[in-house]
Amino acid sequence: MSFRSSSSYSVQSKNVSGGGGFGSSYGGGSSSSFGGGYGAGFGGGYGAGFGGGASSGFSSSSSGGFGAAAASSSFSSFGGNDKQTMQNLNDRLASYLEKVRALEAANADLELKIREWYEKQKGSGIGAASKDFSKYFEIISDLRNKILFATIDNPRVVLQIDDAKLAADDFRLKFENELALRQSVEADINGLRRVLDELTLARGDLEMQIESLTEELAYLKKNHEEEMSIAKGSAAGQVTVEMDAAPGVDLNKILSDMRADYETLAEKNRRDAELWFNQK
């Protein structure tokens, strides 16, 4: 904005100062521009003194423009260097005008760049004024509703989590109890397997005894049949033979005793196993 104010001032100064040669330049413009600096010497002397030209202005125009007293006092201050002074003033004015034109050009270029920058910002949508957020309102409203529903549903989810934790703890206790019971049953099974092995060994022993006694019984039956056949032959020959033989062996009684012993042993093993199981 500082360049804009300088531009306005420069244009006004240019319009006033750029009259028509030396007569109009210092006649109308320099009375205001240089009036404070040069006083009476430049305040209004050049407005009429140089009206007809720089060559004859000192002799003819000075008497009519200022009067005799004013012309003598003005020209006495310049002396013989009036052309040099005018040339210096003209050079200074030209340099000033060049600076004004350069500042105007720089100002115009800067204004163009600023305008292009604003147009670019509007085109790209980066500027806050050019952004349209209306398309996000529906998304924001939907997200707010979801957040509200999630906030309302959160206590229910927390309650379900607590219920699940309690159920998990209950199942954990049940699992631990069942695991302890399973270990106890497995220990009992292992103990019963040892008892079963012992009973199997006892059964094998008894079966071997039964087989041995069966063979002995068959041998005794064979001997008995042979003795009976010999006795029948002797009776047919009218021969009476008195023998002092040992009494016969009752095999049925032996088998009954063996069976009773086996049942007694089995019952004893069963009671021992039951007692061991109850103690566990």
Swiss-Prot record:
Pfam families in UniProt: Filament
Recorded superkingdom: Eukaryota
Region named Linker 1: 118-139
Keyword Ion transport assigned: no
UniProt-annotated stretches for the region Coil 1B: 140-231
Region Coil 1A, annotated ranges: 82-117
Region (Coil 2): 255-280
Positions of region (Linker 12): 232-254
InterPro entries per record: IF_rod_dom (IPR039008), Keratin_I (IPR002957)
SMART domains per UniProt: Filament
GO molecular-function terms, A-Z: structural molecule activity
Record keywords, A-Z: Coiled coil, Intermediate filament, Keratin
Any GO CC annotation of this UniProt entry: intermediate filament
IF rod domain mapped to chain residues: 82-280
Region (Head): 1-81
Subunit structure: Heterotetramer of two type I and two type II keratins.
PANTHER family assigned to the protein according to its UniProt record, in alphabetical order: INTERMEDIATE FILAMENT, KERATIN, TYPE I CYTOSKELETAL 10
Miscellaneous comment as given in the Swiss-Prot or TrEMBL entry: There are two types of cytoskeletal and microfibrillar keratin: I (acidic; 40-55 kDa) and II (neutral to basic; 56-70 kDa).
Family: Belongs to the intermediate filament family.
Protein name, entry field: Keratin, type I cytoskeletal 47 kDa
Organism (species): Xenopus laevis (African clawed frog)
Gene designation: xk81b1
